[in-house]
Each structure stands twice: as C-alpha cells, then as structure tokens.
From Swiss-Prot:
The keyword Lyase applies. GO terms for molecular function: magnesium ion binding; phosphopyruvate hydratase activity. Coiled coil: none annotated. Its cofactor is Mg(2+). Catalyzes the reversible conversion of 2-phosphoglycerate (2-PG) into phosphoenolpyruvate (PEP). It is essential for the degradation of carbohydrates via glycolysis. It catalyses: (2R)-2-phosphoglycerate = phosphoenolpyruvate + H2O. The keyword Mitochondrion does not apply. Mg(2+) binds at residues 241, 283, 310. Its EC number is 4.2.1.11. This is Enolase. Keywords: Cytoplasm, Glycolysis, Lyase, Magnesium, Metal-binding, Secreted. InterPro entries: Enolase (IPR000941), Enolase-like_C_sf (IPR036849), Enolase-like_N (IPR029017), Enolase_C (IPR020810), Enolase_CS (IPR020809), Enolase_N (IPR020811). It comes from Mycobacterium bovis (strain ATCC BAA-935 / AF2122/97). Binds a second Mg(2+) ion via substrate during catalysis.
C-alpha cells in the first residue's frame, strides 16, 4: 500500500512574484511528488481562504504561516494514511481545519498537500496523473481558451472586461488548436503594432492595450484571426470573462464603460455582442451575489451562449447546487484552489455534469510551473481549459503537458473542438 511517510513544504514564488506554497510528499515505497499552489488576482468572496502572513515581508503576502501549518499540523495528520484513498486523505484535511472556508490552516496549505498526495499515488501506481484520476476512458483533449487580450484586474488599463479569449473550435486536434491559437496571438501583436497600441503583457500573457472598449477589443482579435488565415467562428471562436464583480458596487450597480448599468442592461449588452461576434462563452457576466440577475440572464441568452459561473460558484458543490436549482449559468469554472481539495473539486465537477452543466478547467493569474490542471482537464473530460495566452512559461507549461498527453494517447485521443459547445457553436458558423 502507498502509505504516506513524509510531508514537507516551502515558500516559493508564483508568476507575479508573490509567495505561494509548495508541498512535497514521500511514500513508504520511495515514491516522491511535489505540488505548487496557484493564487488569483480577482477572487470570489466565497473562496477557500489563503493563509497569508501580513506584516512587511513580501508586502504582507508571505506564506510562512501556511508552510508551518503543513509542517506542524497537516503533515503529521496524514502521515500513515493510504495515498491512493484520496477521499480519506482530503476528508482528514477538512476535518483537521474545522472551518467551512479552510481559514484556520489555509486553503493554500491544504490544497498543496491534497494535490501532492494525488501525484504521489499516481506515480506509485505507475500511471500518468490524468489516467489515475480519470480512469481508463479519459481521452478527451480540451479546447484551449486562450486569453490573448487582458483587461480588468489582469492589466493596468481602462478595459473593463478581464479576459478576451480565442477558442480554436474548428481544429482537428489539440496540437493544431495550439498552433492556431499561437498564430492568432502573434497576428494580434502585429495588428496592435499597426494601430500604434501597446504590446505589453498582462498577468496571463495576453496583450494589454488600452483600447476604447469591448467591441474595439473584439474587432482587433477578429482582425488577428483573419490575418492568421483563419475564419472567425468556424475555425476560431471568441469568449469573454467579464469578471463583473470587479466593476459592481452595492447600491450603485455595474459601472461599465463609463456608464452605470443594471443587470438587465448588462444582459442587453451581452445579447448585442452575440449578434455581432462569434462568441461561444461568457464567464461571470454579473456579480457573484446577483443570483436573480444571473437567473434572468441565463433565461434570456443561455440557449445561445455558454454562461460560466466562476465567482458565483467558486467550485463549491453547495453553491453550485443552489445555482442548478435556480437556473443560474449553464457551465462551471473549475479552480482547485477555490475549494481547497482535489476530492471537493471532483465532487463539484460530478454535480455539474449530472446537472447538465459544462465544465471549464482554469488556472489562476498567479501561476507556477505545476501542470496538474492539464491532467485534470483530460481526467474529467471537461473539453475546455483556460490557462492563459500561449506565452510565459507558467502558461505554456500546461499546454505543453496537453501535447504530451495527446501524444501518449495516440489514436485514442479525441479533440473536443466545437463539440465542447454543442448548443452554441452553431451560432458561430
């Protein structure tokens, strides 16, 4: 049996130069694995709590307390447990913390241990991680939702929408989808240069020009797709992450592109975009606690576009269950650090799929070289992954891992393509 023998932890840096937690787990059979924890810039209020140190060190963002929690409490609690019983290990972590939001020991400390244990168990079983988690039938390669133009909290510009993504839905394979996305990315750089706009990068590797607004950004990306010799819609669709909580104020409303709007007015705005651009997905179109607005928006345009819940669900099965009951969104964004353990993440995915919701695996803006989410996307058959632009090594690491997985699967590999958006892709053709 792959019994946990040692647990270690350290403070490392993420892609934004902020500290994060890295955990190492050794099993009694000699197997060793390591996991690093990501961190978000725009975070949902209901996410698992990151334990930060405060004070002057690293501007208060140090994670020595979380590291110490692993060394002093979490590690001793899981040593001796069977690593291939992930649910048992994760339940021990949840029980040890004892809070609903993992605020005592820190979601970052708990998640690091959870993921490192899963990796160690996979290695002990001599299985790739995607196969260990997903079983023998895992074979679907996800559509890369590439954030090639950054705004909102990911860029120092006046663009309110946080992410403008391209989705190569018409590609025959993941390797070709990645090529198409990279070529559009480079074409966009040329388009921006021609327009005299900045080609500086945002947090997730996308360009961060200060453009006039949403439609101006979508027009630039559409030009880039055509410049790359591809067809907007049929070959490469568009997607947005509005991260609307970032421009919502209680008592005021949505302060968006220079005007204050209601949820209904935001819905009208998105509906107008659907008529003008080949959009297949809109994430967080409204604020994280605007349940009634979300339900009305979903009823209005949910049959035309994928509506992804991130901040409103925070990968939490309880919040997702409420969303399903109330008709909120039709897809779940999956971020392992929002809920804090692999088991709870998989429970949320199962609930989403049983409820008829699609799932999109996601990185965070503060990333590391850890590639676990690439394996997770294939393991759960999500058909979609969001892990930034095809640039910056912490983003590209995930794409490169997916290339390896596709190669390892050989003839069994299937690229999700437009089947990842069965109700919506027809709108783009």
């Amino acid at each position: 049996m792959p019994i946990i023998e040692q647990v270690g932890a350290r403070e490392i840096l993420d892609s934004r130069g902020n500290p994060t937690v890295e955990v190492e787990v050794a099993l009694i059979d000699g197997t060793f694995a390591r996991a690093a924890v990501p961190s978000g810039a725009s975070t949902g209020e209901h996410e698992a709590v990151e334990l930060r140190d405060g004070g002057d060190r690293y501007g208060g963002k140090g994670v020595q307390k979380a590291v110490q929690a692993v060394l002093d409490e979490i590690g001793p609690a899981v040593i001796g447990l069977n690593a291939d019983d992930q649910r048992l290990v994760d339940q021990a972590l949840v029980d040890l913390d004892g809070t609903p939001d993992k605020s005592r020991l820190g979601g970052n400390a708990i998640l690091g241990v959870s993921l490192a244990v899963a990796k160690a168990a996979a290695d002990s079983a001599e299985l790739p991680l995607f196969r260990y988690v997903g079983g023998p039938n895992a074979h679907i390669l996800p559509v890369p939702m590439m954030n090639i133009l950054n705004g909102g909290a990911h860029a120092d510009t006046a663009v309110d929408i946080q992410e403008f993504m391209v989705a190569p839905i018409g590609a025959p394979s993941f390797v070709e989808a990645l090529r198409w996305g990279a070529e559009v990315y480079h074409a966009l750089k040329s388009v921006l240069k021609k327009e005299g706009l900045s080609t500086g990068l945002g947090d997730e590797g996308g360009f961060a020009p200060d453009v006039a607004g949403t439609t101006a950004a979508l027009d630039l990306i559409s030009r880039a797709i055509e410049s790359a010799g591809l067809r907007p819609g049929a070959d490469v669709a568009l997607a947005l992450d509005a991260a609307a909580t970032e421009f919502f104020t209680d008592g005021t409303g949505y302060v968006f592109e220079g005007t204050t709007r209601t949820a209904d007015q935001m819905t009208e705005f998105y509906a107008g975009l659907l008529g003008a651009y080949p959009l297949v997905s809109i994430e967080d179109p409204l604020s994280e606690d605007d349940w009634d607005g979300w339900a009305a928006l979903t009823a209005s345009i949910g049959d035309r576009v994928q509506i992804v819940g991130d901040d409103i669900f925070v990968t939490n099965p309880e919040r997702l269950e409420e969303g399903i009951e109330r008709g909120v969104a039709n897809a779940l964004l999956v971020k392992v650090n929002q809920i804090g353990t692999l088991t709870e993440t998989l429970d949320a995915v199962t609930l989403a799929h049983h409820g008829g919701y699609r799932t999109m695996i996601s990185h965070r803006s503060g990333e590391t070289e850890d590639t676990m989410i690439a394996d997770l996307a294939v393991a759960i058959g999500s058909g979609q992954i969001k892990t930034g632009a095809p640039a910056r090594s912490e983003r590209v690491a995930k794409y490169n891992q997916l290339l390896r997985i596709e190669e390892a699967l050989g003839d069994a590999a299937r690229y999700a393509g437009d089947l990842a958006f069965p109700r919506f892709a027809c709108e783009t053709k």
